[in-house]
Amino acid sequence: MSKDKKNEDKETLEELKELSEWQKRNQEYLKKKAEEEVALAEEKEKERQARMGEESEKSEDKQDQESETDQEDSESAKEESEEKVASSEADKEKEEPESKEKEEQDKKLAKKATKEKPAKAKIPGIHILRAFTILFPSLLLLIVSAYLLSPYATMKDIRVEGTVQTTADDIRQASGIQDSDYTINLLLDKAKYEKQIKSNYWVESAQLVYQFPTKFTIKVKEYDIVAYYISGENHYPILSSGQLETSSVSLNSLPETYLSVLFNDSEQIKVFVSELAQISPELKAAIQKVELAPSKVTSDLIRLTMNDSDEVLVPLSEMSKKLPYYSKIKPQLSEPSVVDMEAGIYSYTVADKLIMEAEEKAKQEAKEAEKKQEEEQKKQEEESNRNQTNQRSSRR
């Protein structure tokens, strides 16, 4: 019996020795495997760090995502190594087979794959451009529509500059601008409103100027007054356009010196203004009065009375051509004279003119006296003839 026990003890010792050797080999194997896995995890971490260096130019969102995934990978790798060491120790204690460790590794790898998030795809530039071309016009249309529906679309501050003879209200009325008109219409149809303002016969030119946001300035230039048509005590302005104003002005508003016109025919006034515009300002300022003086030969002959009492007879249609010669003749005149430019150019004194007028008047009076004498003689002859006929009839 004792021998059998001894044999059994020997067998158990041998088994224990063999078991300890297997455990040693298993420990060495697991230790090597754990070291290899740690080295593999470190290599992966180095590769990821290198990849992060290459992709550092990418967007911050992507870098954050990659850094998060790298941290998760490193943490998971550390967890794996720790778990593997723990599993090796557990294997030492529990002596579980290698298949169980592989299953755990597969599960952790699957968890790791689920933890990794896919990187966001970058939107191509052409899609951004297409979206911009659609969104920008739509937004602009929305803003314009909202503006047109708001009260600001018709808000206008209109001012008038340059008026002397007219008023700001007259200019606004001539422009045709209404309170309900859109501000944008005034900007787009500036030429139309400027033309309407020029319908006022006082306005020579008009300009509509816009200032942000709602200010409009109408700058006008009026026609000059070149003369005044005089009828009795009333004075009517004649504009540089040839227009005769229908309303008289007060005597207080008259300038110190002005040109008086004693005819009001519209066509003759237009011709006179046109001819007057072609002569020099000095010669123009020397004229005091203009009146019609038609002759048998020249129907449009006019008489210009100068400020120095000289008189010039010149055809209206040739005034701009002939009147400049007066400046050359003037130094030769020693006393107030009449310069006749009807046919040629010659002059005589005002005294001679008065004598000629007196002689002409005497001739006319003599003719009238002769005419009266002839009429009286005819009447006397008729009366004597009547008396003779009456006497003859009474005798019978």
From Swiss-Prot:
Composition bias type Low complexity, residue spans: 386-396
Biased composition (Basic and acidic residues): 37-65, 75-116, 361-385
Annotated region described as Disordered, given as residue ranges: 1-23, 37-116, 361-396
Domain called POTRA: residue spans: 153-223
Topology of the protein relative to the lipid bilayer: Single-pass type II membrane protein
Residue ranges, Extracellular side: 152-396
Keyword NAD set for record: no
Family statement drawn from the similarity comment of this UniProt entry: Belongs to the FtsQ/DivIB family. DivIB subfamily.
UniProt function note: Cell division protein that may be involved in stabilizing or promoting the assembly of the division complex.
Protein's recorded name: Cell division protein DivIB
Gene name of this polypeptide: divIB
